[in-house]
Amino acid sequence: MDTEVYSNTGGQMSKSTPIGAITKFAYSGRGIGKKDLGAIAMSYGHVYVAQISLGANMPQTIKAFREADSYDGPSLIIAYSHCIAHGINMSKGLEQGKAVVDCGLWPLYRYDPRLKAQGKNPFQLDSRDPTTSIEDYMYKEVRFKSLKAASPDRADALLAKAKTQVERTWKEYKYLAERPF
């Protein structure tokens, strides 16, 4: 479960905190991108990895759990999870889980090393290209809205960085999904 903060100790910034989010220890908004845990795990080549969001795509979530369970080796499922530290109505969590995928900040994918033995690409990108703006997602959450209210120039600069990061990540993931294997 990735809440993008240290939820169990009060919502402090972690290496999973996205650009522009205000948290404890990042009061002016996190200025750098989050660590891509999935890419790190995929780099080993023998780890099953999936990134999921139940609110965005339940069939993909179920498929990832089934594949991970059947894989004879280490498996890692990174699941988007809303958190009280995000500053949203908790009944809207699944909607935010869809919004984060729709804007491209949380691509859904599966990496199954077994496919390599079949001559197939092990990386499957399960998300469509982003269909909404990052602002549509971010400014529904207090952790982003409060920076916009307190420091609009900084918020705008970090939003631009977040957009650049999404574009770069999408190019990289699309390359991984489309490359010949």
In which residue ranges do the predicted regions lie?
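A short, terminal or domain-edge coil/loop segment
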Residues: 26, 53-55, 131, 135, ...
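Thiamine diphosphate
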Residues: 1-76, 82-84, 88-103, 146, ...
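Generic preference for well-ordered secondary structure
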Residues: 21, 25, 33, 48-49, ...
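Glycine/aspartate-rich loop-and-adjacent alpha/beta segment that forms the canonical ThDP
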Residues: 58-154, 161, 174-176
